[in-house]
Amino acid sequence: MKTWQELTITVHRDAEEAVSNMLIEAGSQGVAISDSADYLGQPDRFGEIFPDVTQDDMITITGYFPESFAITEVTASLEKQVATLKSTGLETGPVSIASHELEEEDWAENWKKYYEPARITHDLTIVPSWTDYDAKPEEKVIKLDPGMAFGTGTHPTTKMSLFALEQVLRGGETVIDVGTGSGVLSIASSLLGAKEIYAYDLDDVAVRVAQENIDLNANTENIHVAAGDLLKGVTIQADVIVANILADILIHLTDDAYRLVKDEGYLIMSGIISEKWPMVRASAEKAGFFLETHMIQGEWNACVFKKTDDMSGVIGG
């Protein structure tokens, strides 16, 4: 039986996305995340959100490498990369890295044991596609099989995006999902009553995975997935545009978003570390948007901007 090498990094949850990307770039065939916390603050409709997080802030991120990889060299390289994260504003905590061998049969299923049904917002629950789940009447269930290289929908940036969608969608809207990844935000938009959803991702693998996840969920024929580079070439007028991607990419999105968002429509952005938040806010406001909601979880920020002439609901400072 083929043997794989499992490399496990224990790190602060703020560094989850960065470390996961490091593992993939180093050659990992996927990542599994063990996170004891499943939290989302319960904020007011508008304004600042500061969730009360009392659980352990350390998580375990595991990568899976072929037997042929020089795991000692990979480990040394990752140690150096993780050590640089603090200079970017991310908390890493007391980092530890360990590795051991794993049989292929165990590797293929190992990541799934960390993925359990999770109530993300008041209405939305994410459930692994292989799990039987008895939903409560008020729950809207999103079925996902993201694969090891895609998020399971429980990262703070995704949670805040889902919360924002739950707040702004009232039914009948057109939504554009930029950088759809696993497709979770598009599926949520459909469940929350959006009429048409257009999901784009530059990565062909993400486009395929998103479509597979969409097909797992009933009544999602209104979701249209395609390869695309942000909003380039898009002409659809949307009530809501949502983008959970890196801050340095978001700032290149705001002008096109303003062009495509209808009057009184919304731009939801997430994936923003705190030190990048002023830059993203300035970009959106320069494009013509007004800040309506600002959400914070740890070092991560998300926001809802509105295209409006009515200043009564916006945040002034």
Swiss-Prot record:
S-adenosyl-L-methionine binds at residues 158, 179, 201, 244. Belongs to the methyltransferase superfamily. PrmA family. This is Ribosomal protein L11 methyltransferase. Gene3D superfamilies: Vaccinia Virus protein VP39. Its EC number is 2.1.1.-. NCBIfam families: prmA. It comes from Streptococcus uberis (strain ATCC BAA-854 / 0140J). Signal peptide: none annotated. CDD domains: AdoMet_MTases. Keywords: Cytoplasm, Methyltransferase, S-adenosyl-L-methionine, Transferase.
